């Protein structure tokens, strides 16, 4: 079997050990004569899978007991609506940071429900970093403070948790489980699974119990109410059972790797060596302020963009897949989530060096 190094931004690479487990269990899960994909979501087999996945995630992230962990459908984009629907309550204002493509989309959705107040706008820096926090325009009162921890398209990542007394809401879709952080600083965190936690179709929400007491907007459908999902333990209807199962396997994999802190060190090494190569090169360029460079999504351009197609063609021929940049920005993007090995990053750097020698 020959597998390539997959640098896709999402759906993204899944650890091989996890894929082997899925293969071995697919037809007969734990001797029951059925696949876990075939069992009832309310049967004891899947209930056990679901409860174990939640316990493991709570342990990995040190999630306090005062938080519910929800396993939802709809992707992260649905959270752009669910957050204001559930958290605005009597407020007319919510604070947002525009740090790139995904935060901008969230801001657009929020305008359907409130007056989004921009604390700062990275557009002023051409989305190459975040303006200094001392310059942010912060109101004294608002329903919540929303930001995207890692912008997958723009290649920007927050190296700190914003300092605010407002309820923090964070989109961690592309870097949850990639580094330790203090969950208790947040009111709500959400992340789609297809970056670091498996399959598209599952979104994880970690929400403080106090926020579940807020009254949703009157027009909020019952299915979009966090409190109801919490009450029903994410079983209002049939959840994405196979994606939930796979996420649970990945949580086990993270534990077997030594936990989130061990992965954080590995992720830092992977990103550092790739950025170091790009910075030394006269052929490749990354425009992001080093302080805000993403460890998960490394964007770069070729000095001669007429060579883009050739670069991608030769990369694919060398077992390096899905390096094409997002359609809005162009260029290249290497997504190096938890499942990407250091050997994969080394192979990419070696190929880039050889390509530069031939065409630089």
Curated annotation (Swiss-Prot):
Pathway: Amino-acid biosynthesis; L-serine biosynthesis; L-serine from 3-phospho-D-glycerate: step 2/3; Cofactor biosynthesis; pyridoxine 5'-phosphate biosynthesis; pyridoxine 5'-phosphate from D-erythrose 4-phosphate: step 3/5
Binding-site positions, pyridoxal 5'-phosphate: 102, 152, 171, 194, 237-238
Enzyme class, first EC level, given as a word: transferase
GO annotations of cellular component type: cytoplasm
InterPro entries: Aminotrans_V_dom (IPR000192), Aminotrans_V_PyrdxlP_BS (IPR020578), Pser_aminoTfrase (IPR022278), PyrdxlP-dep_Trfase (IPR015424), PyrdxlP-dep_Trfase_major (IPR015421), PyrdxlP-dep_Trfase_small (IPR015422)
Main location per the UniProt record: cytoplasm
Record-listed L-glutamate binding positions: 42
Cofactor(s) of this protein: pyridoxal 5'-phosphate
Catalysed conversion reaction: O-phospho-L-serine + 2-oxoglutarate = 3-phosphooxypyruvate + L-glutamate; 4-(phosphooxy)-L-threonine + 2-oxoglutarate = (R)-3-hydroxy-2-oxo-4-phosphooxybutanoate + L-glutamate
Keywords: Amino-acid biosynthesis, Aminotransferase, Cytoplasm, Pyridoxal phosphate, Pyridoxine biosynthesis, Serine biosynthesis, Transferase
Tagged with keyword Cytoplasm: yes
Protein EC: 2.6.1.52
Localization annotation: Cytoplasm
Gene3D superfamilies per record: Aspartate Aminotransferase, domain 1, Type I PLP-dependent aspartate aminotransferase-like (Major domain)
A molecular function (GO) term: O-phospho-L-serine:2-oxoglutarate aminotransferase activity
Cofactor binding note of this UniProt entry: Binds 1 pyridoxal phosphate per subunit.
One Pfam family from the record: Aminotran_5
Residues bearing PTM N6-(pyridoxal phosphate)lysine: 195
Family, per entry: Belongs to the class-V pyridoxal-phosphate-dependent aminotransferase family. SerC subfamily.
Protein name: Phosphoserine aminotransferase
Organism, scientific name: Coxiella burnetii (strain RSA 493 / Nine Mile phase I)
Name of the gene: serC
């Amino acid at each position: 079997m020959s597998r390539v190094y997959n640098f896709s931004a999402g759906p993204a690479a899944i650890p091989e050990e996890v894929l082997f487990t899925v293969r071995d269990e697919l037809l007969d899960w734990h001797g029951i004569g059925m696949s876990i994909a075939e069992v009832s979501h309310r049967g004891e087999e899947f209930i056990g899978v679901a409860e174990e996945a939640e316990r493991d995630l709570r342990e990995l992230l040190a999630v306090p007991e005062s938080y519910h962990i929800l396993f939802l459908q709809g992707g992260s984009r649905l959270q752009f609506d669910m957050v204001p629907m559930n958290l605005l309550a009597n407020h007319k204002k919510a604070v947002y940071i525009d740090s790139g493509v995904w935060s901008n989309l969230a801001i657009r959705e929020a305008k359907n429900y409130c007056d989004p107040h921009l604390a700062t706008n990275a557009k002023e820096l051409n989305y190459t970093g975040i303006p200094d926090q001392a310059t942010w325009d912060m109101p004294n009162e608002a329903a919540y403070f929303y930001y995207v921890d890692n912008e997958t398209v723009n290649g920007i990542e927050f190296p700190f948790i914003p300092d605010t007394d407002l309820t923090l809401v964070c989109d961690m879709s592309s870097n949850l489980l990639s580094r330790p952080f203090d969950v208790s600083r947040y009111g709500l965190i959400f992340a789609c699974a297809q970056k670091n936690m498996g399959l598209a179709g599952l979104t994880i929400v970690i929400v403080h119990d106090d926020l579940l007491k807020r009254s949703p907007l009157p027009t909020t459908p019952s299915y979009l109410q966090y409190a109801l999902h919490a009450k029903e333990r994410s079983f209002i209807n049939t959840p994405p059972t196979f994606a939930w199962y796979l996420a649970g396997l990945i949580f086990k994999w993270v534990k077997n790797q030594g936990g989130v802190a061990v992965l954080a060190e590995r992720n830092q090494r992977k990103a550092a060596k790739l950025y170091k190569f790009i910075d030394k090169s006269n052929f490749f360029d990354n425009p992001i302020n080093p302080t805000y460079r993403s460890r998960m999504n490394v964007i770069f351009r070729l000095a001669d963009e007429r060579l883009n197609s050739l670069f991608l063609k030769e990369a694919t021929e060398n077992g390096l897949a899905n390096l094409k940049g997002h359609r809005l920005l162009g260029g290249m993007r290497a997504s190096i989530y938890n499942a990407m090995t250091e050997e994969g990053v080394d192979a990419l750097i070696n190929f880039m060096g050889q390509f530069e020698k031939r065409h630089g």
